[in-house]
Amino acid sequence: MFSITTLRDWTPDPGSIICWHASPTAKAKARQAPISEVPPSYQQAQHLRRYRDHVARGLDMSRLMIFTWDLPGRCNIRAMNYAINAHLRRHDTYHSWFEFDNAEHIVRHTIADPADIEVVQAEHQNMTSAELRHHIATPQPLQWDCFLFGIIQSDDHFTFYASIAHLCVDPMIVGVLFIEIHMMYSALVGGDPPIELPPAGRYDDHCVRQYADTAALTLDSARVRRWVEFAANNDGTLPHFPLPLGDLSVPHTGKLLTETLMDEQQGERFEAACVAAGARFSGGVFACAALAERELTNCETFDVVTTTDTRRTPTELRTTGWFTGLVPITVPVASGLFDSAARVAQISFDSGKDLATVPFDRVLELARPETGLRPPRPGNFVMSFLDASIAPLSTVANSDLNFRIYDEGRVSHQVSMWVNRYQHQTTVTVLFPDNPIASESVANYIAAMKSIYIRTADGTLAILKPGT
């Protein structure tokens, strides 16, 4: 199993620190990189604009994906150097950097020859845990080298860390790092040749296809109409967390909370209940959230957006970049029955996956004023299901590497929830604004949701009545 926590909670074992930084020559090549006609993806453009706006307001938004894992013995620096550089040269998502040439237009610069990309190791002496956390959190998305890799060498083991701008990657990077850095390193130190990998896909190609696809959309396109209808049912935007979150006009850092929902046996019984209802585990996850919201707010319809990977082709599955999209989910819960909620939730999720290829930002661009659509407001709610009981994530989750994922804990305006299924348990992790009102609301939501999971698994869930 791997854990998800905030970076401020990380206290690594003492040891010497070696970090891989972009070489001066590579930085010079990046500065000289010509302008590319490839547009940023919608995800990248939205992220860059949010980052610029936060900086202008003196706010510090989360922008990194940070991972660590442990390995026994002393690090073979030469082997690790090979693995890291091979990874960076292999994936074109690391080959570009961006700048604003006016208020809104974003320009991409691309290094033409991957061989010009090189990171070199440097030792950092006498760095405290606080200094190390600050060091890992420094990459920002408007610099080319918005990534850091390093190791902390202790007496009998070392900790590897990677800090990569979300601009370049999405959660699927977990499996990529496991293969291309951990397994590559292990092969090399074991005396084997470098692992043979299939050709990587090009994220640039995805950006071009996405731009062409979204440019062809109109307000009459079926996928756009479905987004407009969903937003219209949520006050013209994306769904809001249903319970009070305090004063969100005041910046709050993010707080992360993880709770166990079910053990392995309960998870198996819960899955059986989902199948009996005509759904999969994922449909049951959204059904439990819907029924919890009904208990807490007396609602008759549950709306939420969930993240999903939009990779579909074999080439895309070999491509590193930011492919994550949003799927709108609607679940009527007036009956208070788990079976009907799970079945409808599964249908809503499955039938809505094609909407993940339509960024909500593009819908807002197309919408006429009379539609009443507007950007998400502070307190919007995003819920995700992560199944680490099956490949490829199970390989990482079931390893003995002590694999950890870190959130930076910077300013948080929304509620992000991940239901995580592992081989031996199912957990929920929630990131939310760190204030007493939001903390109480999230705790109440988790308690209601956990009760429904357990009662469903135990076969004791009767028809739920609001407020019960």
Curated annotation (Swiss-Prot):
<keyword id="KW-0443">Lipid metabolism</keyword>
<comment type="similarity">
    <text>Belongs to the PapA acyltransferase family.</text>
</comment>
<dbReference type="GO" id="GO:0016746">
    <property type="term" value="F:acyltransferase activity"/>
</dbReference>
<keyword id="KW-0012">Acyltransferase</keyword>
<dbReference type="GO" id="GO:0008610">
    <property type="term" value="P:lipid biosynthetic process"/>
</dbReference>
<dbReference type="InterPro" id="IPR001242">
    <property type="entry name" value="Condensatn"/>
</dbReference>
<dbReference type="Pfam" id="PF00668">
    <property type="entry name" value="Condensation"/>
</dbReference>
<dbReference type="GO" id="GO:0071555">
    <property type="term" value="P:cell wall organization"/>
</dbReference>
<keyword id="KW-0444">Lipid biosynthesis</keyword>
<keyword id="KW-0808">Transferase</keyword>
<keyword id="KW-0961">Cell wall biogenesis/degradation</keyword>
<comment type="function">
    <text>Required for the biosynthesis of sulfolipid-1 (SL-1), a major mycobacterial cell wall lipid. Catalyzes the acylation of trehalose-2-sulfate by adding the palmitoyl group at the 2'-position to yield the intermediate trehalose-2-sulfate-2'-palmitate (SL659).</text>
</comment>
<protein>
    <recommendedName>
        <fullName>Trehalose-2-sulfate acyltransferase PapA2</fullName>
        <ecNumber>2.3.1.288</ecNumber>
    </recommendedName>
</protein>
<dbReference type="InterPro" id="IPR023213">
    <property type="entry name" value="CAT-like_dom_sf"/>
</dbReference>
